[in-house]
Amino acid sequence: MLLGVNIDHIATVRNARGTTYPSPVEAALVAETHGADLITMHLREDRRHIKDADVFAVKNAIRTRLNLEMALTEEMLENALKVMPEDVCIVPEKRQEITTEGGLDVLAQQEKIAGFTKILTDAGIRVSLFIDADDRQIQAAYDVGAPVIELHTGAYADAHSHAEQMKQFERIQNGAHYASDLGLVVNAGHGLTIHNVTPIAQILAIRELNIGHSLIAQALFLGLPEAVRQMKEAMFRARLLP
């Protein structure tokens, strides 16, 4: 199983004081060295954390691959075609939200998403759609030609009871298997921590997890190398469990 380390909140800390540190590039390189299989960055329309220059700098520095999260806008499409990341993950975006609140509604935007997917695919960029574990959305993702989906794990991570968490887990597990049966590559992420990652990592249909906020928070106490190492180890151990 692959680990994508999201470095958005390295930029959040930097921007809080308007300094040049901590460096997203340095964070990306440290994460790679200690187990990250790819680097994920979300260039939001309001540029609240990652800036345009960060994306270019990280793309040019890393040895693994860049997964660029972006909204379904012409501006972001143009940016992606300039940066040429290995992967683009199209996500829903609202300016007022603190973080991404739900999955992309592919059903409501099939024509536009299909168009973006073709343009990016023709440019050699693999397209992923960040969606809820809903069979209708998964089918729509397949229909528009996206080869990859990322299942939104936020409801699982934010569940206030074990029963609710198990309900959300089963939804993700069923969605992952449904998507895999369609031939889609299945990733997952949002709200995952060292404490809740094990059940999700046990779902064999899921190929990759993208984890950011909790990992950067752990890095404040453990250091980024150890935070990445512990997360990768937790994922690895989960795959060994019966």
Curated annotation (Swiss-Prot):
The active site is at H42 (proton acceptor), E69 (proton acceptor), H190 (proton donor). GO terms for molecular function: pyridoxine 5'-phosphate synthase activity. It catalyses: 3-amino-2-oxopropyl phosphate + 1-deoxy-D-xylulose 5-phosphate = pyridoxine 5'-phosphate + phosphate + 2 H2O + H(+). Pfam families: PdxJ. GO terms for biological process: pyridoxine biosynthetic process. The record marks E150 as: Transition state stabilizer. The keyword Transferase applies. CDD domains: PNPsynthase. One of its GO terms (cellular component) is cytosol. Pathway: Cofactor biosynthesis; pyridoxine 5'-phosphate biosynthesis; pyridoxine 5'-phosphate from D-erythrose 4-phosphate: step 5/5. It is found in: Cytoplasm. Keywords: Cytoplasm, Pyridoxine biosynthesis, Transferase. 3-amino-2-oxopropyl phosphate binds at N6, R17, G191, G212, H213. 1-deoxy-D-xylulose 5-phosphate binds at D8, H9, R44, H49, T99. The keyword Transferase applies. Homooctamer; tetramer of dimers. Belongs to the PNP synthase family. Catalyzes the complicated ring closure reaction between the two acyclic compounds 1-deoxy-D-xylulose-5-phosphate (DXP) and 3-amino-2-oxopropyl phosphate (1-amino-acetone-3-phosphate or AAP) to form pyridoxine 5'-phosphate (PNP) and inorganic phosphate. PANTHER family: PYRIDOXINE 5'-PHOSPHATE SYNTHASE. This is Pyridoxine 5'-phosphate synthase. The lineage of its organism: Bacteria, Pseudomonadati, Pseudomonadota, Betaproteobacteria, Neisseriales. The gene is pdxJ.
